[in-house]
């Protein structure tokens, strides 16, 4: 099998993983809407509830595709880890889009996984990963503080800060400005298309755009190339 044929397995694996994430996110959102706590117990309950026959078939088929890719040596340890991170990012994006929350039960393990992989020699250097996690959280914390001073209320949740910290752990500190730029432009474009001139007054979850920009950075490297 030639090297290009790995795409024929990667695409169905991605689609099947997406179906599984959508089922988990749907059940999680229903529980949050019903008044459940935003914690790991609710997430575990959603995972158990989503473990239907369809979910298990999708998960098994996706895993089979991944195993074949590993045997073909088309998917190394870092690529496999990043694929898992992209699944978590997709799940976070779906949850935030539905109930406007980014659960710590997903963002914190994602951050620690990035830091541990960096310490194991996969991904950015440990110093860059630590700097990325710290810079991601502190930068958005500072932006939010300025927004509170200016408008009198918070402009984003702590989950966005923790998500950017997790992306910094996986990507290092250098790509974070590009990730933020891509996410901000995407959010602004969607707001303008949806609300027109009233876009500046609209509230839109930032997590899906951060997750999309970060996932693209994990898969392809730089999201936006600065000319300097």
PLM region spans:
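A membrane-topology feature that recognizes alpha-helical transmembrane segments
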Residues: 1-228
């Amino acid at each position: 099998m030639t090297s290009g044929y790995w795409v024929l397995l990667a695409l169905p694996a991605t689609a099947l993983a997406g179906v599984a994430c959508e089922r988990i996110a749907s059940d999680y959102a229903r529980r949050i809407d019903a008044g459940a706590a935003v914690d790991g117990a609710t997430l575990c309950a959603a995972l158990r509830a989503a473990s239907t026959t369809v979910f298990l078939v999708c998960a098994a088929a996706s895993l089979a595709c991944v195993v074949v890719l590993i045997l073909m040596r088309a998917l190394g340890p870092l690529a496999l880890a990043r694929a898992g991170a992209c699944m978590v990012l997709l799940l976070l994006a779906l949850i935030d889009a539905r109930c406007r929350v980014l659960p710590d039960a997903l963002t914190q393990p994602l951050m620690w996984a990035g830091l541990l992989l960096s310490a194991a020699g996969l991904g950015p250097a440990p110093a860059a990963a630590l700097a990325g996690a710290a810079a991601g959280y502190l930068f958005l914390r500072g932006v939010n503080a300025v927004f509170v001073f200016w408008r009198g209320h918070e402009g984003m949740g702590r989950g966005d800060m923790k998500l950017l910290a997790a992306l910094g752990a996986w990507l290092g500190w250098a790509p974070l400005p590009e990730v933020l730029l891509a996410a901000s432009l995407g959010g602004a474009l969607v707001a303008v298309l949806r609300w027109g001139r009233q876009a500046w007054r609209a509230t839109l979850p930032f997590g899906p755009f951060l997750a999309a920009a970060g996932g693209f950075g994990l898969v392809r490297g730089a999201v936006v190339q600065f000319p300097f």
